[in-house]
Amino acid sequence: NKGQVSSKLKRMIGFVSSRVTGCNYCQAHTIRAAERYGASDKQLENIWEFRESRDFSDKEKVALEFSIAASSIPNRVDENLSKELRKYWDDGEIIEMLGVISLFGFLNRWNDSMGTRIEEEADVSGKKYIKGWNPIKHKS
């Protein structure tokens, strides 16, 4: 929980990254952690409408956009996004966010490939906040 990027935002970045890669296990855990670290119900319920939402600052919006682009294959971080990102974040903060995205790149692949069994508390958060929640792969 150290660094310049808030713990709340790092968890939302992890959630967005996990959603892009499709790992239900990590989605549930990151949305639960974002809630614990202070994300509002409105932010969590509408995280995919962040671009138009007043519940996210411009700084948070570009961070979530970065998470989507950096988590995509092929990578979609382009010059325009890089310029927008640097309006709000310095190199250290960008590296911190990319560290979260990279960590979840590993965790998403590991937990999804292994079908890691989801814990009851994480399942509750998934049902509460994630539209289309279906962790069947992680229930056995």
Residue ranges and their predicted role:
Residues 1-140:
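Hydrophobic alpha-helical segments
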